[in-house]
């Protein structure tokens, strides 16, 4: 509890300091402003362990699409990220038909039935980062701030199994200018506190779907509060950028993400993902 209280206090103080600087600073028409729009295609290698359904599922070289908007206004960095990832995990059940023994409760007889899994996995992330530069010169910039993220892990196998998360936490970014055309950046995000909705086992979304028909807002009552004791996650982003002109650049990068959501405690979800990305950026 002391660690959680310490993190809460530090995060609150950081937000207060950033907010005070926003409102205290006078408007200056000559301040530095820029907007960057980036689109990247990532090639993923990773896996996830959804223990409410299966032990381990993975897929290599699955595409991931990401759209970023980065706004630098004076001393502040605003970044909005939307990304989507889809795969059909490879396993024995998805590669070939499985024959299993079933029971007919009407006749009381057993019979054999063929089954082939159509398992698919989707991941959607929306994130907003706000950071203030604490160190800056002609070659490098260091930003520290916070982020708000919405994550959805969707798994479909004849019926949906959906995990939804809202979280806040600290974020930091480092930009280094190698020369006039080349630059390198690193960004790190950590969710500390949040709220998540996750079924206790696969196929137990009947109540969720019932609430969706009756009143969508009732779904929020099915969730749990998250912190370091039941959610651990980190997101790292490395990117090299080459400027072709003042308004266009291309880049290469690598992202790494780890997440563990222990709700329910006995059946956590693990998500480990690394991906190489190619990026095109337009700057205004």
What is each residue range found by the language model?
Residues 1-38, 284:
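Cleavable N-terminal export/targeting peptides
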Residues 24-93:
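Short glycine/proline- and aromatic-enriched beta-strand/turn motifs that initiate or cap beta-hairpins
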Residues 31-39, 74-80, 138-144, 180-186, ...:
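Outer-envelope beta-barrel architecture signal
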Residues 55-58, 95-103, 159-164, 201-209, ...:
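Flexible, surface-exposed loop regions and adjacent strand-edge segments
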Residues 57-65, 76, 118-126, 140, ...:
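Residues that define the transmembrane beta-barrel architecture of outer-membrane proteins
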Residues 160-245:
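Outer-membrane beta-barrel transmembrane domain signature
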Residues 242, 272-284:
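Outer-membrane beta-barrel "beta-signal"
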């Amino acid at each position: 509890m002391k660690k959680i209280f310490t993190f809460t206090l530090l995060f609150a103080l950081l937000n207060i300091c950033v907010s005070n600087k926003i409102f205290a600073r006078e408007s200056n028409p000559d301040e530095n402003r820029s907007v960057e729009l980036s689109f990247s295609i990532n090639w993923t290698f990773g896996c996830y362990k959804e223990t409410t359904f299966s032990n381990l599922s993975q897929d290599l070289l699955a595409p991931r699409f990401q759209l970023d908007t980065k706004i630098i206004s004076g001393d502040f960095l605003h970044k909005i990220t939307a990304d989507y990832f889809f795969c059909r995990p490879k396993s024995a059940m998805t590669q070939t038909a499985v024959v299993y023994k079933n029971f007919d409760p009407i006749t009381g007889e057993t019979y054999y039935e063929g089954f082939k899994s159509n398992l698919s996995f989707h991941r959607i992330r929306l994130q907003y980062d706000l950071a203030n530069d604490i160190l800056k010169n002609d070659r490098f910039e260091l930003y520290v701030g916070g982020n708000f993220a919405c994550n959805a892990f969707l798994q479909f196998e004849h019926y949906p199994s959906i995990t939804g998360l809202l979280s806040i936490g600290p974020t930091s970014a480092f930009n280094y200018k190698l020369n006039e055309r080349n630059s390198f950046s690193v960004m790190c995000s950590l969710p500390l506190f949040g709220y998540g909705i996750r079924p206790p086992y696969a196929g137990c979304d009947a109540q969720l779907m019932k609430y969706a028909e009756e009143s969508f807002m009732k779904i929020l009552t099915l969730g749990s509060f998250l912190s370091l004791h039941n959610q651990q996650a980190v997101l790292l982003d490395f990117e090299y950028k080459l400027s072709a002109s003042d308004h266009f650049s291309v880049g290469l990068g690598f992202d790494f993400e780890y997440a563990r959501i222990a709700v329910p405690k006995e059946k956590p979800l693990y998500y480990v993902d690394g991906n190489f990305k190619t990026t095109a950026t337009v700057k205004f």
